[in-house]
Amino acid sequence: MTAYLNALGLICSLGDSREEVSRRLFAGDRSGMVFESGWVPERALPVGAVKSALPPIPPAVHLHRSRNNQLLLAAALQIEEDISQAITRFGAGRIGVIIGTSTSGIDEASESMAVWLRERTFPDDYDYRQQELGAPANFLAAWLQLSGPAYVISTACTSSSRALLSARRALDMGLCDAVLCGGVDSLCKLTLQGFSALEAMSPQLCNPFSSNRNGINIGEAAALFLMTREADSKHSIALLGAGASCDAHHISAPEPTGRGARDAMLQALRNARLEAEQIGYLNLHGTATQHNDAMESLAVQGVFSSGVPCSSTKPLSGHTLGAAGALEAAFCWLSLAPQNTEQALPPHLWDGEADPLLPALQWTHAGSRLTPENARYMMSNSFAFGGNNISLIIGDAP
């Protein structure tokens, strides 16, 4: 079944509107990546922080107060009119909410726990619903007064890719007529200190697929789609295919040959009834860790033997973890949107020092365009702990 991505709201370090994110994405503007101290002891790290003011949580749902939900609200307000029209057309009980996250309101919980440890009492404004993993979906459903299925998926870095896949299944099964789907994650000490303990954090701006790569940068973002069975009057961008695999190689390290990642990409192609040669652009998971980039290079070579224009957009946004799958699907959506009249593609930013141990890939740059020879089909990869792999294909529906 074709699942149309009719509306998109997003916010990340690149900006707080589709227009601003598009402009800075295609220009390769990484000024949103800033060095900040306080996240981990004794050093500053580059992070993809959202610096714009966030909307307050409405009083009627104030118990859901968290930065995570504020980011999600900022994205939802961008498509509020589309959501209202869907509610009017389908009814509140026929609209689902499926969101991916890995943090939820854990930063607010950490701050409240620190108060409890000092004073043996929680702050007056603390509520468990701030930190509950299902909070983002519960918050959106409560704010919009929706009564359709509402739940959160948390599979680390594939969370919001799985949310899009699950939303399409909900439409296909007749559980919903429309689904608000996407992902959200916010910067928090627990996450950054955890990746620092794994020695996976780069002290510099990340450098994916370079021989000098030395780890990730973390970011925060929210990306929210309105998915339905029918095309929007302005475009026909849709989720055409999805592939999922779980190779269960290791709790945190990817399977080194790329077998699981390759399986996910091949499944997505079969699901979309496309050949590898029809993909015009590939958004790589591209974390800039030694193991991910080596594995993903092998997997891409195994699927796209003739090459495919590709890039990692994490140097522009940071790795937004539970939001990354939806955010990078959104980057593909923006590449296909009618407003992208120049057919620009997201550039690959790195130092140009290719790793001689990795297969050579076909990198995009700031002047890259989706040429007439390239079909308007794009793939986006997300790979997570535990060998959890997702590939999505987004493009113009026939």
Model-inferred region functions:
Residues 1-5, 65-81, 87-91:
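N-terminal amphipathic, basic-rich helices that act as targeting or association modules
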Residues 13, 103, 156, 287-289, ...:
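Glycine-rich phosphate/pyrophosphate-binding beta-alpha loops
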Residues 33-77, 94, 104-118, 123-166, ...:
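Conserved catalytic cysteine-centered active-site region
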